[in-house]
C-alpha cells in the first residue's frame, strides 16, 4: 500500500479524490521515526503492552504475533492540545494467533493515526476497539485496516467517538478479505456522537472482498443531540453539559473498560470529563 508523498497512509482502494479521504498526511513539522518500537509474542505466549504518547511527536510500533500466541496492546495518545501527534501501528498475526488492541486518541491539535493488522495465518483473530475525542478546532485523521489473508480468520473493529466545537474528523475503517481467506468473518462498526452543529464528520467504512466464501458486516451510526433527548435529561436535573457528558461516557464505556490499569483508566476518564465540561459545544 503506497502512501502519498506528503503522508504515510492510504486507504486500500482509493475513492474520488475530491472527497479528500484517500491519503492520511503527517501533521506539518512531524516525520516518522527511522526505528520503530518492536513488540512480539512467541508461540504459546500471552503478553500485554501499554504504549503512551504524551508529547508532541511521532510513534511507530511494529507487532509480531507468532502462531498460537496472544498479544494485547493498549495505545494511549494524550498529547497537549496545542501541538500535533502522529502514530503508526502495524501488526502481523500468525496461525491461531490473537491480537487485541485498544486505542485512545484524545489529545493533540492535529492527530494522524494508522492501524494496520494483517491476519496472515489461518484462524488468526483481531479484536480492535478505538476511541477518539475532538473539540474546538482540532483535526482528527484516522485510518484503521484489517487485512484477512488466512482461512477462517476473525476480525472485529469497534470505534466510538465524540465531536464538539469546530472539530474536523476523518475516520477510514477497512475490512479487506484477500483471495484465499475462505470461511473468514469480519465486523466493523463506528458510532460517533456529534455535539455541535459546526463539527465536521467524515466516516468512510470500506469492506473489500476478493473471496466469495466470507461473511463481513460494516456500519456507521452518527448521532446528534436532539431537542427531545436533551429536554428529557435536563428535566431530570442535569444541565446541558452534564447531559452531554452522560451520553458520551455511555458511548466510551465499552472501550475504557478494556484498559486493565485502573490508574490509567481513571486518568483518561478524568481527562475526558474535564474536556467535555470545559469544551465548546455549539459556538
Where are the regions that the model predicts?
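Membrane-helix cytosolic exit motif
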Residues: 252, 256, 264-265
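Short cationic/low-complexity microdomains
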Residues: 19-21, 181-182, 247-248
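Extended amphipathic alpha-helical segments enriched in small hydrophobics
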Residues: 229-254
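Aromatic-residue hotspot detector
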Residues: 16, 171, 251-252
